[in-house]
């Protein structure tokens, strides 16, 4: 193995452990906390040296894009991660994961979905689901499906061709999309298109 300082080895080991346990790499802040470095610039310096040594690769445009290159030596299974499309907008008439809708891809553990299931992520805008623990700027992890049971949290397309995340209820004469915020009214629809069921939430802690 390329010669590393103790700090560099600690950082590389922490990245490896986070990828193996969570399926995606840690943030710079998390790395600093794990190895006892208060300065993010110092962490960036160590990451730059690891990159120079060919042990990691970074994408400076993304906060968590740290790829461990020495995977065989570090025993990181490539099959443990799937790249999930992050949807920037939902275009009526197009599949939810159409190229026109995808902003980027985010690594998640394959355990989030069965092999035959399709998963996407969507950024939450607003506070309509705060009582369900889904906050403004969170990303929901969504399993694609066109049906839902009463009480499921879903991504649905309204009659105005707008995507919304709400709790789903099918009632006698209509569908009710219920917010989880007592200050907001439900959306009542005669027709609704289900795009998927929310199965998880991802949040950046700043």
Swiss-Prot record:
Gene Ontology biological-process annotations: DNA repair; DNA replication; negative regulation of DNA-templated transcription; proteolysis; SOS response
Subunit composition and interactions: Homodimer.
Catalytic activity entry: Hydrolysis of Ala-|-Gly bond in repressor LexA
Protein name according to UniProt: LexA repressor
The entry's DNA-binding region: 28-48
The EC number(s) this enzyme carries: 3.4.21.88
Family annotation (NCBIfam families): lexA
Keywords carried by this UniProt record: Autocatalytic cleavage, DNA damage, DNA repair, DNA replication, DNA-binding, Hydrolase, Repressor, SOS response, Transcription, Transcription regulation
InterPro entries from the UniProt entry: ArsR-like_HTH, LexA, LexA-like, LexA/Signal_pep-like_sf, LexA_DNA-bd_dom, LexA_repressor, Peptidase_S24_LexA, Peptidase_S24_S26A/B/C
Family membership noted in the UniProt record: Belongs to the peptidase S24 family.
Active site: 128 (for autocatalytic cleavage activity), 166 (for autocatalytic cleavage activity)
Residues annotated as site: Cleavage: 92-93
């Amino acid at each position: 193995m390329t010669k590393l300082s103790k700090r560099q080895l600690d950082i590389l080991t922490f990245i490896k452990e986070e990828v193996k346990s969570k399926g995606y790499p840690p943030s710079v802040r998390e790395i600093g906390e794990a190895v006892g470095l208060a300065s993010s610039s110092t962490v960036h310096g160590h990451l730059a040296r690891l990159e120079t040594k060919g042990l990691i690769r970074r994408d400076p445009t993304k906060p968590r894009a740290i790829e461990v290159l020495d995977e065989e030596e570090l025993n990181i299974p490539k099959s443990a991660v799937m790249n999930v499309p992050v949807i920037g907008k939902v275009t009526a008439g197009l599949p939810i994961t159409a190229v026109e809708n995808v902003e980027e891809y985010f690594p998640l553990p394959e355990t989030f979905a069965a092999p035959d299931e399709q998963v996407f992520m969507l950024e939450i805008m607003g506070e309509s689901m705060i009582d369900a623990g889904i906050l403004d700027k969170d990303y929901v992890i969504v399993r694609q499906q066109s049906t839902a049971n009463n009480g499921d949290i879903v991504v649905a397309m309204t009659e105005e061709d707008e995507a919304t995340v709400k709790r789903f209820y099918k009632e006698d004469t209509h569908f009710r999309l219920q917010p989880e915020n007592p200050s907001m009214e439900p959306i009542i629809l005669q027709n609704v298109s289900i795009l998927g069921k929310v199965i998880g939430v991802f949040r950046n802690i700043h």
